Amino acid sequence: MASVEASNLVTIRAYLAALEAGAVGQALAKFFTPDAQQVELPNRLNSNGRLSDLPTILQRAEQGQRLLRSQSYEIKSEVAHGQCVAIEATWPGTLAVPLGSLATEATMKAHFAIFFEFTDGRIRLQRNYDCFEPW
């Protein structure tokens, strides 16, 4: 594996660990280029999908901190090729507040496929395919 690919995988693992730890602001922004975008494809929580720029990504991280008591990412598989990384992960998130029919402390579970494109060692584009288990 080329050193750039290995480095990008290390960055993604650190990024997911930062999300698990509740990183916001600069602690999260450091993983992204200033012109970064996140594309969230339609899913149970966001039926129309969403395109977010970096300020919106950071704002949503703060919202997530209020919504979730905890979250984790269990990487099932990962692959890097050039400036691209793809991961498959299982995600459980425990609610800090009620959400729809779910009570506080309920755990949601999802299966993610996330594709990243890098520029200069930072995430320029993130595409999420999030499949939530029924609740």
Roles of regions detected by a PLM:
Residues 1-10:
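Basic/polar N-terminal segments that are highly enriched at the extreme N-terminus
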Residues 1, 17, 46:
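Generic anion/oxyanion-binding catalytic loop in active/binding sites
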Residues 5, 25, 30-82:
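A solvent-exposed, acidic/Ser-Thr-rich amphipathic alpha-helical stretch
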